[in-house]
Amino acid sequence: MVFRAPLDFISASRLLLPHFADAPPVLSRSRSPEHPPAGFLSLALPGLCFSATQIASVCETLEETGDIERLARFLWSLPVNTDGRDSISEHESVQRARAVVAFHTGCYRELYRILETHRFTRASHSKLQAMWLEAHYREAEKLRGRPLGPVDKYRVRKKFPLPRTIWDGEQKTHCFKERTRGLLREWYLQDPYPNPGKKRELAHATGLTPTQVGNWFKNRRQRDRAAAAKNRLQHHRICPDSACTLSGGDSSERADGDTFLSVTDSDSDLDV
């Protein structure tokens, strides 16, 4: 039997395999998607003929709809090609679907194996990178018994860098690509306190959210103020007499107001 449309499979499966869609949940975080439970092999589809394109389309549709249970059942029903030629499992949509199922079932070892051994196209990178990082975050949280803070997540990212199979090789810092950070720095030099409109414009230009843009500017202002305070302290230690100190000691800013930012300025991001 050959299906004209990918989702014809789902309708046909209800007739040929009544329990395919209505079977009780079989996914658990302790079971690998590569090893279905006992008796589950009866869900294989003898006599049904799918093209590789149709199988890929079914995987993509079920992935997009978020139906992980049915996606897992469909993957387990696929035949195993033992001769290694034109294997269905080598199709990117099938590999990505297996990675999605492994992630949602907590089979992180299997997820890492899939991501490290199959080279994915750029279109899949963003989603797979997010799964790679989130899986490592969850494992670290479970090991430490507490939620991870920003520094903890940074250390996890340094310990488990993205594999080149899901990464284009461009250097990243705090998950922002270098070209994104360069654009942020250019705007910061022009205006370290962008209004909501400018934040939205910059967010559109960088692919970030307005909140991410606002947080980056806030953190950059804090770092600049800390560096300015350190420089003033070092200057005071070198020239302790009043002649060398900055004029207007009760002010937290330089007289020109350009070199240092005021510590009293608001860093609120409520206007995002």
Swiss-Prot record:
Subunit structure: Interacts with GMNN.
Source organism, top-level taxon: Eukaryota
CDD domains for this protein: homeodomain
Record localization: Nucleus
TM regions (residue ranges): none
Function: Transcriptional regulator which can act as both a transcriptional repressor and activator by binding a ATTA homeodomain core recognition sequence on these target genes. During forebrain development represses WNT1 expression allowing zona limitans intrathalamica formation and thereby ensuring proper anterio-posterior patterning of the diencephalon and formation of the rostral diencephalon. Acts as a direct upstream activator of SHH expression in the rostral diencephalon ventral midline and that in turn SHH maintains its expression.
Gene: six3
GO cellular component: nucleus; transcription regulator complex
Organism: Oryzias latipes
Region span, Disordered: 244-272
MF annotations from Gene Ontology: DNA-binding transcription activator activity, RNA polymerase II-specific; DNA-binding transcription factor activity, RNA polymerase II-specific; RNA polymerase II cis-regulatory region sequence-specific DNA binding; transcription corepressor binding
Gene3D superfamilies in alphabetical order: Homeodomain-like
Keywords assigned: Developmental protein, DNA-binding, Homeobox, Nucleus, Repressor, Transcription, Transcription regulation
Protein name: Homeobox protein SIX3
Residues in the DNA-binding region annotation: 169-228
PANTHER family: HOMEOBOX PROTEIN SIX, HOMEOBOX PROTEIN SIX6
Family, per entry: Belongs to the SIX/Sine oculis homeobox family.
Pfam families: Homeodomain, SIX1_SD
Entry's Gene Ontology BP terms: apoptotic process involved in development; cell proliferation in forebrain; epithelial cell maturation; eye development; forebrain dorsal/ventral pattern formation; lens development in camera-type eye; lens fiber cell apoptotic process; lens fiber cell differentiation
